[in-house]
Amino acid sequence: MNVRAKKKPQQREMASASSGPSRSLSKGGVSRRPPLARVRVAVRLRPFMDEAKEPPCVRGIDSCSLEVANWRKYQETLKYQFDAFYGEKSTQQDVYVGSVQPILRHLLEGQNASVLAYGPTGAGKTHTMLGSPEQPGVIPRALMDLLQLTREESAEGRPWDISVAMSYLEIYQEKVLDLLDPASGDLVIREDCRGNILIPGLTQKPITSFSEFEQHFLPASRNRVVGATRLNQRSSRSHAVLLVKVEQRERLTPFRQREGKLYLIDLAGSEDNRRTGNQGIRLKESGAINTSLFVLGKVVDALNQGLPRIPYRDSKLTRLLQDSLGGSAHSILIANIAPERRFYQDTISALNFTARSKEVINRPFTNESLQPHALAPVKLPQKELLGPSEAKKAKGPEEESTGSPESTAAPASASQKLSLLQKLSNMDPAMLENLLSMERLLGSQGSQGIPLLNTPKRERMVLIKTVEEKNLEIERLKMKQKELEAKVLAQEALDPKEKENTPTILQPSSSCSGSVAKPLKKAVVMPLQRIQKQSESSNKIHLLKKGHKRKLESSHESEAVEKDEDYWEIQISPELLARGRKKLLHLLNEGSARDLRSLQRIGQKKAQLIVGWRELHGPFNEVEDLEQVEGISGKQVESFLKANLLSLAASQHSGPS
């Protein structure tokens, strides 16, 4: 005894490195990248449940650290250091004020926050989150303070409309169930284009006071699945998540919208079925709980190790906690532990998980956007939405004859400015600098007219954008006309003898002249007609002559003129295709991965898949058997045949006849 009194127990530091408090978003920050915010962790030690006195296996050192007996070495203790430690005599008020209350302010800034209660079964998680009427827990205290904050913000005269809504769900045996509407069944977890996690179909109840919250929350809490085990008479058999959404809408320009979410999560405790004696449905529930908590540990380890893939999708729990761990939320993890020695292994496991969790880094940011009505597109008249030719036809004869260019140009330019206003609202400052340089250059050359920068910025950008679009449209029309002229000239340059040897069904129109009408206003393409039968030869590639009539409407004449036009189409004989298919099948069965990569639409991955399938199942009976290879679909096989049969058939023949 004297030796032990003189020799102090050795202490092993466990997770002693602690960083500073998490930083919130800085309003005047220059960098657009969200600041880092570490997951803050707290440990709460519940009192003894039994009357029998026994020495505890956990002892608090100060407000941030504790020590646990080391079962491997009797004279050593394991020391843990966290952001906060609440001992046996700590109250619900101490836990709430010390860890949870500071993060509520972030919700009014449009940021997310999460509070998770973690620990083994019977450690007091539900008591910490819910409490009792005499000692309310985190959830009722947080809702009471949050509603009070919204009332204070509204009373200060800020130009924001604030609304609060709640949702309540549980994850029971990997099923997401709505506690506010138990008849809704299993819900799915989705992710939007911005990476936000959402649950379509989840009931949302607006609340304006704490009494309204109790009216919805208390009946829903009775829908949660609980059961009795040897270690806990009211053991939670599911993970419960209370989601509180705070929406703010600005009444004045620029009509911003902010959304902050608060996740209050009561996790089910991990269980040792040898000690709990679970059987039947309890055993199945315990397996689902332990599996989800195991995946939760894998997610924390992957985040700490910086792995490229984080296994969020391996369980419904981690999928829902994707924003809380490694996401954009201010997260608080409250680990609940028991002092009894029979919970020693569970306590060590919970403390180790908590120590790893405090190294997880989140990046909170403000969820702010413009309200939908502020982004509504400007509705243009029907004539503004039509093209130049259609707009001209849409006009009446009186409107077309009496309208002046000056009167029609002004509405068109105004509508173009309005339609492009939203697209150019966030123009790059570098573009403005280029415009300033352009104006100085025009001024030095003696340019006359209205200076470019005398107009407002947004209208100036709209004008420049409109001019660029018109120039591009003119260039496209010029290129299209050149292509049409070149096509007609190439058809006229065909050998007359070849034209005579080619039988045609369509007779040339007598009214069609050899010259090309320069101003083409409208072209109507008639259905194709086949004009040459397939040759009896079965070992060649043939050119089939195709023809169609085209109506040309002259800008000077109202009558339409029909013109016969010819073009050529390739047709391959069936025997040549059969030889190409045979060669392709031989290459698929005998060729190496390098030979397969020489084919069209076959890369390194597909070549390896084909070789592997061939080694397992033997040679292909036909080319269409590629559909049986995992990773190659029927459409891919069809495009593969089209791309390779023509090239293989052409390689076996010198050319068309």
From Swiss-Prot:
Location, primary (coarse class): nucleus
GO cellular component labels: chromatin; cytoplasm; cytosol; kinesin complex; microtubule; mitotic spindle; nuclear speck; spindle
Coiled coil: 457-502
UniProt cross-references to CDD domains, sorted A to Z: KISc_KID_like
Gene3D superfamilies: AF1531-like domain, Kinesin motor domain
Compositional bias ranges of the Low complexity kind: 16-33, 402-415
Post-translational modification note: Ubiquitinated; mediated by SIAH1 and leading to its subsequent proteasomal degradation.
GO molecular function terms listed in the Swiss-Prot or TrEMBL record: ATP binding; ATP hydrolysis activity; DNA binding; microtubule binding; microtubule motor activity
Transmembrane region(s): none
Pfam family for this entry, one: HHH_3
Subcellular location: Nucleus; Cytoplasm, Cytoskeleton
PROSITE patterns found in the cross-reference section: KINESIN_MOTOR_1 (PS00411), KINESIN_MOTOR_2 (PS50067)
Ranges where the record places region Disordered: 1-33, 388-415
Record GO biological process: DNA repair; metaphase chromosome alignment; microtubule-based movement; mitotic metaphase chromosome alignment; sister chromatid cohesion
Keyword set includes Signal: no
Binding-site residues for ATP, renumbered to this chain: G119, P120, T121, G122, A123, G124, K125, T126
Function: Kinesin family member that is involved in spindle formation and the movements of chromosomes during mitosis and meiosis. Binds to microtubules and to DNA. Plays a role in congression of laterally attached chromosomes in NDC80-depleted cells.
Family: Belongs to the TRAFAC class myosin-kinesin ATPase superfamily. Kinesin family.
Subunit structure, as described in the record: Interacts with FAM83D and SIAH1.
Protein name: Kinesin-like protein KIF22
Lineage: Eukaryota, Metazoa, Chordata, Craniata, Vertebrata
Gene for this chain: Kif22
